[in-house]
């Protein structure tokens, strides 16, 4: 059931059920929106502001009603559109303090670079995060958007971009809120429970979002599934789980050996086999939907990820009525309503 949008453009919106939409998932950008009857939260803004708004509209979501952005960690594929989106909408951004500081260190020098220098740094960042860089995508657009904070055109009259100074501080946000892993907090009527995950970032976290009796767990960008994270994910109605790579494809693939080692390390990414091991041995079977996410376009195939998960669940899949879905890089996933 789709949400009923209010006639006024700002903030409030009536939603009949809790709704989750993965807008983008993969090495080139990640973003998910979770909505309750009173609150709408964006988890990560890993695509440009223009692309983010476009995908939200395609999914039937209204960007004007976003209440906050949560950040899992500071890697580019999770923060590309963060500053522009937050400023356009005038909404707070929630980080751990270490992630915020790492983000500021990374974004501030980049604004003072030429496009060539910025692109070289972006390629280096992409290699570090095992993200294939597509020169035909929106590199120039992303650079110009960050340099000028240009207006985002959605439809005439829908969103009026606020005037910004051409040389606005790239690290300036409308409001910054800090949280700590292990300590729950609330955004509107959504309770957010962050937990530490093993990844090569300053202070990476996963989230469990709970509202109206529904629990949504988000666990991507982790080298392995630690016991405390597994415990946090118990009782979730929706589980977004990383299934990044097929080990054989990664070993035989195009990445430099140093990047392959990083991806396979305990601070890298969860493989299909590792995700399947979690589902077989630690998953409690409570989720109506299991969303396999952050699939590598270079080192994985959707069907390989699906087959590994289905085999792990075995006969319990039909018994528990689990439904396995695949989040994609290029388009929003069909929304889940509960």
Each predicted region: which residue ranges?
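Cap/insert and terminal regions of metallo-dependent hydrolase folds
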Residues: 227-327
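Active-site neighborhood of phospho(di)ester-bond hydrolases with catalytic His/Asp-centered motifs
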Residues: 43-46, 66-74, 95-97, 217-220, ...
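Conserved beta-strand hairpin/beta-sheet module of binuclear metal-dependent hydrolase folds
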Residues: 11-59, 205-220, 238
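Active-site metal-binding motif and surrounding structural segment of the metallo-beta-lactamase
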Residues: 49-100
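Metallo-beta-lactamase
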Residues: 98-205, 211-212
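Short, basic/aromatic-enriched C-terminal tail that caps enzymatic domains
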Residues: 322-338
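Metal-dependent catalytic neighborhoods of phosphoester/phosphodiester hydrolases
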Residues: 80-89, 105-107, 300-307
């Amino acid at each position: 059931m789709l949400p009923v949008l209010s006639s006024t453009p700002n903030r409030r919106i009536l939603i009949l059920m809790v709704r989750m939409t993965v807008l983008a998932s993969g090495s080139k950008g990640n973003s998910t929106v979770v909505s309750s009857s009173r609150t709408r939260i964006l988890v990560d803004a890993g695509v440009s502001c223009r692309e983010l708004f476009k995908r939200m509209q395609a999914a039937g979501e209204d960007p004007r009603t976003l209440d906050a952005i949560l950040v899992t960690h500071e890697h580019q594929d999770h923060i590309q559109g963060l500053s522009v989106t937050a400023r356009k909408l005038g909404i707070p951004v929630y980080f751990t303090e270490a992630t915020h500081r790492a983000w500021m260190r990374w974004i501030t020098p980049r604004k003072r670079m030429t496009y060539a220098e910025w692109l070289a740094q972006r390629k280096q960042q992409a290699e570090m995060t095992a993200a294939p860089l597509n020169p035909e995508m929106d590199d120039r657009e992303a650079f110009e958007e960050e340099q000028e904070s240009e207006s985002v055109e959605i439809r005439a009259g829908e969103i009026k971009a606020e005037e910004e100074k051409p040389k606005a501080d790239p690290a300036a946000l409308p409001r910054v809120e800090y949280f700590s892993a292990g300590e729950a907090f609330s955004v509107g009527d959504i309770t957010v429970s962050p937990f530490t995950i093993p990844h090569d970032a300053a202070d990476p976290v996963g989230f469990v979002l709970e509202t109206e009796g529904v629990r949504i767990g988000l666990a991507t960008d982790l080298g392995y599934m630690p016991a405390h994270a597994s415990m946090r994910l118990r009782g979730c109605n929706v589980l977004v789980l990383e299934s990044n790579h097929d080990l054989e494809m990664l070993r035989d693939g195009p990445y430099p050996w140093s990047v392959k080692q990083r991806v396979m390390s305990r601070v890298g990414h969860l493989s299909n086999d590792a995700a399947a091991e979690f589902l077989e041995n630690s998953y409690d079977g409570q989720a109506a939907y299991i969303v396999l996410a952050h699939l590598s376009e270079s080192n994985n195939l959707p069907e390989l990820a699906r087959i590994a998960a289905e085999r792990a669940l075995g006969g319990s899949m039909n018994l528990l009525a689990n439904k396995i879905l695949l989040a994609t890089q290029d388009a929003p996933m069909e929304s889940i309503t509960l």
